[in-house]
Every structure is written in structure tokens, then in C-alpha cells.
Amino acid sequence: MNATTAPLPYSAARLHELAHLLIANIRELAHAGWTPATSSNFSHRLDEQHAAITVSGRDKGRLVEEDIMVVDFDGLAVGRPLRPSAETLLHTQLYRRFPEIGCVLHTHSPMQTIASRLYAGSGVIRLEGYELLKAFDGNTTHETAMEVPVFANTQDMQVLAAQVDALLDKQSMWGYLIEGHGLYAWGRNMAEARRHLEAFEFLLHCELELLKLRGTR
């Protein structure tokens, strides 16, 4: 480090570690077809003030370490002058609000997107009686119900973040849908966030298949 270079306000070693963790998991999700056309964004808590997050507009199946950047919890770039996802505030609001949350994943699978369109009018998808509800932290039985919120899509992330915050004031949840867009899911770490994401995907698939079999909603 020369005399004109300010020290980084976060651990470069920790960022290196998280970049590789994110890239490995994101690549698997990309290969599953959940991140088409450079869509989706992913992050991991770096420390008490920063998160590592994917740079905007990058092919998620071909990420390299330079495609992971650092933002503070106001969503501002730290260290390198890169552009984070437009939806960065939807990640950082969770880290700011819940110190225990360590990872946020946002994907655009066909199932997630179709479900978000079908249930946009009601604003919620009710999942009930499924054994896989036990995949969500805090659930110990299939004899329970979970309501997955569906928010209207908007390009104003301040508005959407405020709507999410207002709902979090009333209920606990591990994810939500955005109409015509995709799914946000999170957890205490990457493993838990992946478990929640995959459980949502499976359960939404089941609900859509039931709709086809019943012929009505």
C-alpha cells in the first residue's frame, strides 16, 4: 500500500472468500436456468456494515471474482467504483434490519415468474400442508401454513423497500415474490438461503401443477 492509498474499510481476505462462495453457488443456479439473460442478483453479509454483491449486468453463469463488489448498507459502492444491481436496496434493507441474516438470493426461474403473475391480484400465495414447509427455519411440522407475499413490480426501489419493511413489521418471512419478476429468499448463511430458495421453488411448482390439474384457481 502506498502513501496515497487509503486502507479498505473491510477485510479483503473475507471478500475473497465470499466471492468464491457466491460464484460457486450462483453458477449452479445459473445452470439450473434461474438467472436468464444476466438477470438476478446475489449477496452475502461481509461484516456489520458491508455486503458483497454481484455487479450489475454480468452473466451469472460466467462470474469471476471481479464481478463481486462491496456495498454499504445504504447500497453505495465501497472500494471500487462499480455499479451494483438496481435492486441492491432490497438486499441491504434485510442486512440492516436483521443482524442474523447473512445471505440474500434473488432469482428469475420460470416457475417463480409465472406464479408471481398468477397471484399478483391476491397479493399472496398460501402454502399449506406440505412436508417441505419444514425446510424453512422455525417450521417443525407440515401442519402449518405459509403466506408468500407478491409485491407489485416497480422501478422505484425506495418504494418497494418501504413496502417490504411495512410487511416485515407485521410478520416474519423468508422470502417474497415480485410480480412478473422473480423471488427473493434469504437465510443466516448461504446454505440456509439456498435451502429456503429451493423449497420455495419446489412448493411454487407444486402449486402451479395443482392449478393445472384442478383447472381453476
From Swiss-Prot:
Gene3D superfamilies recorded: Class II aldolase/adducin N-terminal domain (3.40.225.10)
Biological process (GO), any one: monosaccharide metabolic process
Short name of one Pfam family: Aldolase_II
Binding site for Zn(2+): H106, H108
EC number: 4.2.1.109
Free-text remark on how the cofactor is bound: Binds 1 zinc ion per subunit.
Keyword Amino-acid biosynthesis among record annotations: yes
Catalytic activity: 5-(methylsulfanyl)-D-ribulose 1-phosphate = 5-methylsulfanyl-2,3-dioxopentyl phosphate + H2O
Enzyme class per UniProt: lyase
Name of the molecule in the record: Methylthioribulose-1-phosphate dehydratase
Organism whose genome encodes this protein: Xanthomonas axonopodis pv. citri (strain 306)
Phylogenetic classification of the source organism: Bacteria, Pseudomonadati, Pseudomonadota, Gammaproteobacteria, Lysobacterales
